[in-house]
Amino acid sequence: MKEKNQLDILIPVFNEDETIVKTLKNILSTVSCNYKILICYDYDEDPTLKIIKDNFPYNLKIIFVKNFSYGFNNALISGFKSTTAEAVLIFMADDHINHDVINLCYEKFIEGYQVICPSRFIKGGKMI
């Protein structure tokens, strides 16, 4: 029987070909639970897709989800509609620095928190 994902990581992309490889390498080498990465994209010609396919050709953790419309919000909605995991985390394609927060967020989920919203932009926000 196939084990269910504990975590789906949604990454909305739009021309992120310069940053996505580093971001994915960091996630793939850091996250410790059973997870999938859902790449939510607007259009088939987005250079991000080719870069991912060229650098991670046989990685079964990476799933491509085409946006039903266009734009960031619709990409997230498309991603949420495609999730199957217990927990969902939104991660930015150009954030190759804060990948360690993924495990911390998942730990908080396991502790019983239903919404975890880390942000480096919220006044008084901090890494836990």
Question: Would you name each region that the model predicts?
Answer:
Residues 11-25, 43:
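Active-site beta-to-alpha loop of glycosyltransferases that engages the nucleotide-sugar donor
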Residues 68-82, 87-90, 96-128:
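Acceptor/aglycone-binding surface of glycosyltransferases and processive sugar-polymer synthases
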Residues 25-34:
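Short, acidic, metal-binding catalytic loop of nucleotide-sugar glycosyltransferases
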Residues 35, 49-82:
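Conserved donor nucleotide-binding strand/loop of the catalytic core
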Residues 41-49, 95:
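A conserved acidic beta->alpha catalytic loop
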Residues 18-22, 46, 50, 74:
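Residue-level preference for short helical/loop micro-motifs built around acidic side chains
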Residues 6-8, 36:
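Cell-envelope/extracellular polymer assembly enzymes that use nucleotide-activated donors
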Residues 8, 41-44, 66:
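Structural signature of the Rossmann-like NAD(P)-dependent dehydrogenase/reductase core
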